[in-house]
Amino acid sequence: MSRHSQLKLAMPSVHGAPATAPGSPMNAKARSVKLGLGVNQRTGRVQWCPGLTCCKMLLLLPVVMLPLTLVLILIMRLDGMLAALQLNEQRMRDLRNSHSEVPVYMEDYEALLPEGSTYNDLINEEFILPASKRTQLQILAAERARRCQPYRYGNGESMELEERNTLMKDSRTSFLPLGIPRECLGSGIELDIKPIDEEAYQRQKKRYQDIAPYWLEKIRIRERREAERHAEEASAEISEATAALQSFWNEEGTREGIRMTQAKTMKRYMDNKVDPCVDFYKYACGNWERLHPIPKDKAGFDTFEMLRESLDLVLRNLLEKNTPVHSAAELRKSPVRNTLFKLNEQGEGEGEADQAAELTAERLRRHIVSKRQLLNRVLVRYKRYTNGTKRKRLIETPRERTKEEEAAPPVVLPKDKTKDKSDNEEQLHVPTDFLKPHQDAQLKAKNLYRSCVNSAVLAKRGLEPLHTLIRELGGWPVLESQWSESNFNWQVLAATLRRYNNDILIVQWVGADIKNSEENIVQFDQTGLGLPTREYFLQPSNAKYLQAYQRYMAEVMHKMGASKADAQRVASELVAFETQLAGITAPAEQRLNVTKLYKRMTLDQLQAVVPEIKWRAYLQSLQDREVLGTEEVVIYAVEYMSKLVTLLDETDPRTVSNYMMWRFVRHRINNVDDRFDDIKQSFYHALFGREESPQRWKVCIAQVNTNMGMAVGSMFVSRYFDNNSKRDTLRMTHDLQQAFRDILKTTDWLDDTTKQLAEEKVNAMSLKIGYPDFILNPSELNSKYAGIEIYPEKYFENTLNVLLHTAKTEQAKLHERVNKTNWQTAPAIVNAYYSRNKNQIMFPAGILQPPFYHRHFPKSLNFGGIGVVIGHELTHGFDDKGRLFDRNGNIHKWWTDSSIRGFDERARCIIAQYSNYTVEEVGIVLNGESTQGENIADNGGLRQAFHAYQRWLKEHPSEVSDEILPGLNMTGPQLFFLNFGQVWCGAMRPEAIRNKLNTAIHSPGRFRVIGTLSNSVDFAREFNCPLGSPMNPQKKCSVW
């Protein structure tokens, strides 16, 4: 049957009856047909797949297959993206390996350019870059163009067509959007860098060769400022203890708050897991190093350094604060200016007279001075005019008063009873000093600081000031091939450098004669060296330091202009020469007994002993006067002088000149810009372990405080110092003196004669606490620095002026009577001193701060802090050197032989005790011999301070309950010892420890605590330490 006949049979009848019976074979066949036309038995209609079987299958297949298909597509898509990312990462890794400094993104491209230029500037060839930089940028541009090509529609030059279409298709149809790198987003910048025409580059190179140094300098300044900013941010994050110190200077906080803060600080430093009877230093300071890691710009960090940091911040604020040109004291001089003074006192206008105003005033003053002759001529003409009869009559004849003036009450000016008529007439004229702000000592100190921190001016001036000075001194052979030895005389150069306060080859000064402390006399000694001690040159174990020193020399010379080969050759020669020089100096252990070194003679006698040196000519060049052969001098190194002239005769004059100039230039590079900082840092890292150079402002604070300490101290004392602390310290000093007298009476190894003389010496001690009074008197303070000219923009010349003034002032003391009331120590210093030839104790204002002292502290802390310091300095008058000087500061034998033997026996015990201590960090044993003076003072000071504290407790029984701190379960005596121990908390780098042990006369802080407390029966009693424990040994050493 044909298809048509089958179709016909399947059609329904006209009457709507079924064509076939339900049970017929035809019906069974129709149901079995899967895909085709058929009659739906229920409706009687012709349709595809009657019975819905096929439709169900058609619907089911897509529903099941579509999700599976989407999942497969997604997996394939992710695999493709992962492969592309891995390929991209590998390419970037390869690029970074071959160009490690090449950045990735646009802002990183611009980091390669000079400050102020952009990526477009490079494309337009407006800025010239080194070839290496241009190569890097070309590589970057090519790599970026390759990565970004898929996202740039229509461009397929750099890719295979199939690969580009595939990626572009993925980017348009993917279910997850394709991540576009941010450097490929539309930034308006053409991604393809134009090839740099080498010819154009060479043409532009000449055009911009003058601009390049400018850009490099700007980049260097920007980098330095960024480094300083980061350093300041780190410095700003000071510890709670340092913050408390700032609060102290600002007189902030209540009594209870201050005590609570101190208790919290002390608890933080302590390690309560350590038994105080085993190791009290670890018990008191166990957490110090964790809380105060050593700053990168320091070789060590201890309590003293923390206090100096706090004080430096205070001094910085004072020196950077703008000051009106005219001081308040000057403004007070006349009635008119009294008003200005009141405004000045109230602070109105403060900060408006900035540095520019000061400079303007200075220039105006100089302009007026330069026009002095013209002004005088004008004044003469004025006088002639007023002397004329008619004109004089016209000037002197008063005009008639108006009615209003007649009716007005008379004006009565305030009468100054202390002034006479002539004084009032003088007020009509501007005082001379009013036009000379440069005479103000405080302003000079501020200008010295400003000239030091002005990096822009220093960079602009470069090395020219230093080169000019070198030429004036006769030149530096390493820099001058034409240098001639015929014009060289080492004695003339040594005297000239001494005028700049530099002692090279010969040390000379004018000071009190140790055998006649009332007389100033010229004195000579052996030279110092370029490294801390002679052992650095002579001991093979110190070879690495000597190599670092030689490298330091060579790099400075090369930076100054010498060729690298010449610099290295000359540095080698100088190290060899200085090693010989070190060999002729006497070691420290041979110089302990100063009486054996002391030789007093006339210049004629000295000339006979060492005839090669023209002693009179040397001194005449320093004194600016004729010096006679009968002039008496003191010399401590006769043998050295004889060996020196022999060494110099055997040495090439060129080497001698190179060495002397090196020793001078080495210090002068500190007075130019920062170009030598990296060289110095490398050297000091090798010597002390310091990791970074200190910030420039810190260096400048130290320079100004060293060279103009009284001017800085006047600002500090006026603003911050509390005279109550001065009175408290003076009272405590008297208590400590009495404690020493009490101990002296119980000392059984001194005979009565020596005891009596020792007590007289204690009674005669001069006490200098806080500051000298003259610094608060502007005229006296100004006169001290009257001979120094300071310019706000000439740091190099300022330093030379200070050095010249210092040396001249010292030399001028010759033949003058010693003024024992004078202060030689700047007030803003964290230290204390004892002067043997003045029998004087000095406690500068800078040390009167926590943890040494606070007026709200319990007495236990003050006695354990500043009290121990007072006792320490007092005991220096009776240590191995101090005992040689009598009450007047003269050295002679005033002890009996039996008393000397008793002292020596006890001193040997101290020497042996400290010689048994080993510094574990470096494996070096302490030198008990060289540190005995300080160790004796430590032990004596602690005993006296505790004795004075116990006496105070007995005299103030009602205040015993107040001798505690909140949160610390300790008695007053225990707090005394704890504060003493924590004064010496600190840490040092290994290199710095080695240097300290080789040079210092103090024991490390750890042993100043352990050694002292293990000798104290008072400590053992207060902490209940069993006899025989490490901190309470059977054998104890004690001198005082």
UniProtKB/Swiss-Prot annotation:
Residues 251-1040 form the Peptidase M13 domain. Its cofactor is Zn(2+). Its EC number is 3.4.24.11. The chain crosses the membrane at residues 56-76. It is an enzyme of class 3 (hydrolase). Residues 1-27 are annotated as: Disordered. The active site is at E873, D938. The keyword Disulfide bond applies. It catalyses: Preferential cleavage of polypeptides between hydrophobic residues, particularly with Phe or Tyr at P1'. Glycans are attached at N387, N593, N723, N819, N916, N969. Optimum pH is 7. Binds 1 zinc ion per subunit. Disulfide bonds join C277-C1025, C285-C985, C452-C700, C909-C1037. Disruption phenotype: RNAi-mediated knockdown females lay fewer eggs and display a reduced hatch rate when mated to wild-type males. Wild-type females mated to males that undergo RNAi-mediated knockdown, lay the same number of eggs and have a similar hatch rate to those mated to wild-type males. RNAi-mediated knockdown in the dorsal paired medial neurons impairs middle-term (MTM) and long-term memory (LTM), but has no effect on normal aversion learning and anesthesia-resistant memory (ARM). RNAi-mediated knockdown in all mushroom body neurons has no effect on learning, ARM and LTM. The keyword Electron transport does not apply. This is Neprilysin-4. It comes from Drosophila melanogaster.
